[in-house]
Regions:
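Acidic/His- and Gly-rich active-site-bordering loop/insert found
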Residues: 2-101
Length: 101
């Protein structure tokens, strides 16, 4: 039996099915407490980037790794190679938090 739902309905269904895990992942990232206002080197931002890389790997992205550049905060990097020629969506978000106040 094929799924007759629209792409949006399928996406919303997937979100509903995995929302608790996503919230747990987000809470874990916030608990790391990496603050980008603190200058590099910043060990908590490295831990935050490593946590994002682990999430990327779990999601099936390829080549997930932390990129560290001199004088800059770490970047979480990965590639999606699973569907050549398919539409691609990139969601960019900072993996740091801001200090209280």
């Amino acid at each position: 039996m094929s799924d007759q739902r629209s792409p949006l309905e399928r996406a919303l269904g997937q979100l509903e099915a995995t929302l608790d895990q996503h919230l747990d992942d987000l809470a874990a990232l916030v608990r790391i407490g990496g603050i980008s206002a603190e200058p590099p080197p910043n060990p908590t931002l490295v831990r935050s980037a490593e946590a994002v890389v682990a999430l990327m790997s779990r999601a099936g992205l390829h080549g997930a790794r932390v990129l560290e550049l001199e004088g800059a905060h770490p970047y979480a990097y990965a590639e999606w190679l699973g569907a050549p020629g398919a539409p691609t969506l990139l969601l960019y978000g900072h993996h740091d938090v801001q200090p209280v106040g």
